[in-house]
Amino acid sequence: MAKKKLGTVARLSELDKSLRNRLLRVRSRLLFIVHSAIGAGVAYWIAVEVIKHGQPFFAPMSAVIILGLSGGDRIKRATELTLGCALGVGLGDLLIMQIGTGYWQIFVVVGLALLVASFVSPAPLVSNQMAIGGILIATMFPPGDGGSIDRMIDAFIGGGVGILVIALLPSSPLDAGRHQVANVLGIAASVLEDVAASLKAKDAAKLNNALEALRRSQASVNKLETAASSGKEATTVSPFLWGDRARVRSLYRILAPVDNVIRNARVLARRAVVLTEDNDTVSDEQIHVIEEIADIALRLSDLYEHHKEISEALEIPELVNRLRQLGSEVGEDIAEDRVLSAQVILAQSRSIIVDLLQICGMSRESAVAVLVPTSESPAYPPELWDDED
C-alpha cells in the first residue's frame, strides 16, 4: 500500500503517535525482546546450574544491559561494559565486606572504583560501570558469604552471554536502516509538499508551523546513522550475515544523500518563508518542480518502507527518468527576473534532485551532469534528458 501524502506536522505526528507506527515499533523491537529474554534466562541458568551460585542477580542483569546497547561498535562497548560491571561488583563486594556500609564508605568505594577504572581502561563506560557496580553493592546488596568473587563471576557470565547472543543471534542488518531511510524521505516529501502548497497560497504561517515541527526530525536522522552502524557491525561479527555485506554497503552509501535531502529541504523551506513574508513569488514552473521532487521522495520512502526488490527494480528506473526530466527543466530561466529568494529555492531544488538521483544509485558526478548547466564551464559535461529518447 503506497504512502499517502501528508503535511509536515501530520507526518511527524504519525511517526510519533499513530497506531500503525506504534505496532511497527513493537515489531521492530521483537527480536531485541527475544534476545534479552533468552540472554537473561541463559545467564541465570549458567550461574545457578553450572557454576552453582545461589542468587546470581548480576548474571541476568548484565546480559540485559549488554543486549540493550545500540549503534556501532556494540562488541567493543559490550566488552567495556562487562569489564566495568564485573570489576565494580568485585571491588565493591571486597571493600564493603571489610569496611561496612555508610556515607563515607560510598565515598571510598566510588573513588577507588574510578581510580582503578582509569588505570585499567581509558573507556568512560568502564569507569561508569565500575562506579555503578560498587554503589549497588554498597547500598542494596550486603556482601556475599563467599567473598567478592561470586558476584563478579556472575557479572562476567551475563556479559559473556550477552556478547554471544549479539554475535550468534543477530538482528537483520537492513530492516531498521531501511525503515529510518523511509521515515526521513517521508518527512522531506511532506516538507516539500507544504512548500509547494504554501507558495501557491502565499501562506507563510503554514510554512512556519512546518518548520517548527521539522526541528524534531533530527532524531530520525540520528536513528538512521545508528541503524546503519549496527547493520555494518552485524555483518562483520556474525557469519550468518556475511551474505548481506553488499546490501549494507549500499545502505551506507546513501546515508549522506538522504541526510542532504532533509537538510536541503529545510533550507528551501526557510527561504520559502522569507519569500512569502516579503510578498514575492516564484514561477509556476518552480512550484511544479517542487511538487515533482516531493512526489518522487514519497515514492522512494514507500519503496524503502516495504523493501521489495522486485518493486525497486521496476520503479527506480522510472524515478530516475523523472528526475532526469526535471534536471533538464531547472535552468536559470524558470527563475529569471525573480528575487534572490526565488533563485535560492531554485538552487536548493537542483541540489535535492542530485541527492535523490544518488539515492537511486547514481554517482554524484553523473547526478550533477543531469542538471541543465548554469555555468559556461560546468565541472561535469551535461547529460540532459531528451524527450525523444
UniProtKB/Swiss-Prot annotation:
| Main localization (coarse) | membrane
Record's Pfam families? Answer: FUSC_2
Q: List each coiled-coil range.
A: none
Parts of the chain that traverse the membrane: 31-51, 96-116, 123-143, 152-172
Its domain of life reads Bacteria
Record InterPro entries:
Memb_transporter_dom (IPR049453)
Q: Look up the record and report any one GO term of the cellular component aspect.
A: plasma membrane
Where does it live in the cell?
Cell membrane
Signal peptide extent: none
Keyword Membrane belongs to the record: yes
For membrane topology, the record states: Multi-pass membrane protein
Coiled coil as a keyword of this entry, yes or no, is: no
Which keywords describe this protein according to UniProt?
Cell membrane, Membrane, Transmembrane, Transmembrane helix
Q: Which family does it belong to?
A: To M.tuberculosis Rv2571c.
Q: What is this protein called?
A: Uncharacterized protein Cgl2769/cg3067
Whose protein is this, by species? Answer: Corynebacterium glutamicum (strain ATCC 13032 / DSM 20300 / JCM 1318 / BCRC 11384 / CCUG 27702 / LMG 3730 / NBRC 12168 / NCIMB 10025 / NRRL B-2784 / 534)
